[in-house]
Amino acid sequence: MTRLWASLLTVIIYILSQFLPLLIVKKLPFVQYSGIELTKAVIYIQLVLFLIAATTIILINLKIKNPTKLELEVKEPKKYIIPWALLGFALVMIYQMVVSIVLTQIYGGQQVSPNTEKLIIIARKIPIFIFFVSIIGPLLEEYVFRKVIFGELFNAIKGNRIVAFIIATTVSSLIFALAHNDFKFIPVYFGMGVIFSLAYVWTKRLAVPIIIHMLQNGFVVIFQLLNPEALKKATEQANFIYHIFIP
């Protein structure tokens, strides 16, 4: 399969997995559902579709006969995948903490992404959703935003690699941020996209940003489920430190 077809199918499958549940529940036998029953039906359908989408996307991309120049370059040895992923995870968490402090100063009060809040509410009602938020979601997003959007742009832009990286990263990270539909948190998602793209280019392995993304999502969801008050205290302490250095 050519890379163009694989990329198009990857994006189409991802979009369908997002919106098909809403169309399916409008049909029999779901029309009799309402309230929490309807919500659960949508979520369970989406979980199944996500799993099918992830499996299909992986298989499609394994069939590519003409990989990008980046994918043909010498990759980091497999033994360094986890160390690089852990480093990337640390960078993402530090970045999020710094941006959260800035957002708190701008908007006042503890800032929590509405997107994250929705995921936490669903995870409390349907625990298996944690697996999909932590594993399947990041896998799908990295194939779409890093491998397809970033990868194709980086491959298409000729000349200076730094310029190509900046353009491809800016475009893919902005789309990644806008896709999360949290206007105030665009800087958070944009920065995450930059780190994921950097990890991909540096290691030449998509597995690295996928694992970083999985660790980040898993940590945030589990942390907020188990100890939501700890997040508030951590934010207050960070703000205290901020005011020491910047009165």
UniProtKB/Swiss-Prot annotation:
Disruption phenotype: Deletion results in decreased expression and abundance of secreted proteases, hemolysins and toxins, as well increased production of surface associated proteins. A subsequent drastic reduction in proteolysis, hemolysis and pigmentation is observed. In turn, virulence is attenuated.
Group of enzyme by EC: hydrolase
A biological process term (GO) from this entry: proteolysis
InterPro entries, alphabetized: CAAX_protease, Rce1/LyrA-like_dom
One Gene Ontology term of the molecular function aspect: endopeptidase activity
Signal sequence, start to end: 1-17
Main localization (coarse): membrane
Residues forming the catalytic site: 141
Pfam families according to UniProt: Rce1-like (PF02517)
Keywords carried by this UniProt record: Hydrolase, Membrane, Protease, Signal, Transmembrane, Transmembrane helix, Virulence
Record keyword Iron-sulfur present: no
Localization per record: Membrane
Topology of the protein relative to the lipid bilayer: Multi-pass membrane protein
GO CC terms in record: membrane
Outcome of substituting residue 142 to A: About 50% loss of hemolytic activity
Transmembrane segments: 42-62, 81-101, 119-139, 162-182, 183-203
EC number: 3.4.-.-
Keyword Magnesium: no
Reported function: Participates in the regulation of the Agr quorum sensing activity and plays thereby an important role in virulence. Mechanistically, elicits a protease dependent control of Agr activity without playing a role in the processing of the pheromone-precursor AgrD.
Name the UniProt record assigns to this protein: Membrane-embedded CAAX protease MroQ
Organism: Staphylococcus aureus (strain USA300)
Gene that specifies this protein: mroQ
